[in-house]
A protein has these predicted regions:
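A solvent-exposed interaction/effector surface
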Residues: 5-191
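N-terminal hydrophobic targeting signals that begin at the initiator methionine
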Residues: 1-2
Length: 191
């Protein structure tokens, strides 16, 4: 069981580094104005959950090292994931200096799990989220986020929390890039 978890984690680590490249590229593009029609967005009520993560500030260039450290520390501390790997991106990368962006990589965990530094135990508390499923290469998730933000604006919502991405494929290395699935959450409220 532990061996399979580690193998899957390594595959996820490599794939997530590609996903971050997509965020960086897409956030340098401005969203088109007008009605967004080629994306499905739903407003959902989600349950708060506990997760462990490694937090970073700055460019996404060390994502691979951060994921590797996360997985290593979880294994050392016997902290087991209770769901898909997540990435959380604080602030607005389209407006922020890339060297000041705060981001996290992590996994949902059992709330009784004991977590020690450098891992942090946190709780996702945003319960009203806009949700869209991005299907395709991780490098293009940023395009979906921009479309979701436009959808929020067009429908009278404002984003009021960090971007959360859930990486749904257990073994991204055995999935065609065009079939990779990333669920994107944007916390929101009526504007």
């Amino acid at each position: 069981m532990k061996k399979n978890w580690l193998k899957t984690s390594i595959f996820v680590s490599l794939s997530v580094s590609l996903m971050i490249c997509g965020l960086v590229a897409a956030f340098s593009v401005t969203a088109a104005r007008g009605q967004v029609t080629d994306i499905k967005v739903e407003i959902k009520e989600v349950e708060p959950f506990v997760y462990c993560s490694l937090s970073r500030t700055g460019s996404f260039s060390d994502i691979e090292a951060a994921v590797g450290e996360l997985l290593q520390q979880m294994q050392i501390q016997n902290v087991f994931p209770m769901g898909s790997m997540i990435g959380i991106y604080h602030g607005d990368p389209t407006l922020s200096d890339p060297e000041k962006i705060q981001w996290e990589v992590g996994f949902p965990i059992n709330e009784q799990a004991l977590v020690q530094a450098p891992l942090q135990k946190k709780q996702w508390t945003f319960t009203n989220v806009a949700v869209s499923l991005h299907e395709g290469p991780y490098e293009k998730t940023g395009e979906t986020i921009l479309k979701m933000r436009q959808w929020l604006e067009d429908n009278g919502y404002v984003q009021n929390g960090p971007i959360l991405e859930r990486y749904l494929d257990a073994d991204p290395s055995s999935t065609s890039p065009d079939r990779l699935r990333t669920e994107i959450w944007l916390p929101c409220k009526k504007g």
